């Protein structure tokens, strides 16, 4: 009986830890400065079209700074018309979003413009 109780406790604890880690890792939008919108135009140098959020590395046209841009979840991007092919390296885009409060080269995208087509991500 003690062994079953111990196993149940360990399984419960493992589930709780996994859930907490996933929750903390997923939505931390308060870490972005929503009071100061920022637009960055440039060329995508790398992209990841995966969950929980797609990402791109964007070399800014103005100054060459490389930004880590957090996009939307894949299902939302697909529903709104942003395909994986549209965010491949070499594509020129413009992103409107909010800069991370602590990471100077990271931003969360509200929308992205590709080939003069503006796509809302939030």
Regions found by a protein language model. Give the residues of each.
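Bacterial N-terminal signal peptides
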Residues: 10-20
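OB-fold/S1-family single-stranded nucleic acid-binding modules
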Residues: 100-122
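N-terminal secretory signal peptides that target proteins for export/translocation
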Residues: 1-6
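Conserved hydrophobic positions within beta-strands
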Residues: 42-44
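Short aromatic-glycine-enriched beta-strand elements
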Residues: 50-59
């Amino acid at each position: 009986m003690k062994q079953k109780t111990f196993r149940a406790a360990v399984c419960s604890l493992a589930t709780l830890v996994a859930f907490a880690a996933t929750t903390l890792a997923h939505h931390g939008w308060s870490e972005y400065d929503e009071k100061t919108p920022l637009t960055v135009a440039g060329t995508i140098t790398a992209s990841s079209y995966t969950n929980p959020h797609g990402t791109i590395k964007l070399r800014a046209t103005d100054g060459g700074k490389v930004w880590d841009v957090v996009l939307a979840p894949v299902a939302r991007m697909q529903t709104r018309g942003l395909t994986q092919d549209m965010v491949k390296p070499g594509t020129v885009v413009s992103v409107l979003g909010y800069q991370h409060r602590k990471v100077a080269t990271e931003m969360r995208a509200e929308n992205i413009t590709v080939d003069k087509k503006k796509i809302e991500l939030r």
